[in-house]
Amino acid sequence: MKFFLSIFIFSTLTLVGCDSSNVKVKSSNSELSKYQKNAENGDPIAQYNMGVVYQQGLNGEKVDLDKAVYWFEKAAEQGEEEAKANLGIIYYTEGTKYTNITKALDTFSELSKKDNRVALNFLGRMYKDGVGVKQDNNKAFNLFNRAAHLGDLSAQFNLGNMYFNGEGTPLDYEKAAYWYNKAIINGKDGDAAKILAGMYYEGRGVEKNINKSIELLQIAADQGDQEAAQNIEIIKRECGC
């Protein structure tokens, strides 16, 4: 049987305002109005929240990087670290007028010294890909490791990949499975679920378990992953389960 397992090197870029932030942004009209008023009155958390609203296009608002940057800068001026991290992500993201790899590197490097998990993860990505720095898997691994232990979901997935591929560390499928599972438990990471499903299907780093493989593939399929859905049907036909 051919199992269409896709091995992803890195997860989709995740904005700090989503899964990595300590600030939860509610998107009701009343909350948005409250954020706007408090932001204008100088509240750094409200300013950060307004930045997230425009960065992600919440509550029917269109994505507006100009407004997002405006509010993140206001919050950052008052020491709001998550706002600084989001500015770093905007600088890192390709294809906008704000793209500036040097500023992204400076921002993430500064915040990483304060154990900001988002900055550590993105700095790890820069070293893994050789973006703005000399490519270095060892540094990437160490940065992902720090961020993963601090609870960053993307870093947990990325650390799993480093163990899976033996990059910056000896290949270790058991540790890869551990960190993929962390990303699934903490954030229902569909990419991690699909890779771990393949590991259970093959018995690689974990005890072979077809039912567990199907269960994990379903997590990815529920998020719209057509390949995962197809694999479920293939496995069920092969095993008659």
What are these regions (language model features)?
Residues 15-17:
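C-terminal motif of bacterial Sec signal peptides marking the signal peptidase cleavage site
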Residues 19-21:
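Bacterial signal peptide processing site
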Residues 25-33, 61-71, 97-107, 134-143, ...:
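Structural signature of tandem alpha-helical TPR/SEL1-like repeats
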Residues 36-38, 74-75, 108-111, 146-147, ...:
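Canonical positions in the second alpha-helix
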Residues 40-43, 56-58, 77-81, 93-95, ...:
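Short helix-capping/linker turns of helical repeat alpha-solenoids
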Residues 49-56, 86-93, 97, 120-129, ...:
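Hydrophobic face of amphipathic alpha-helices that form TPR/SEL1-like repeat modules
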Residues 211, 215-241:
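Terminal, low-structured helical/coil segments at or just beyond the last alpha-helical repeat
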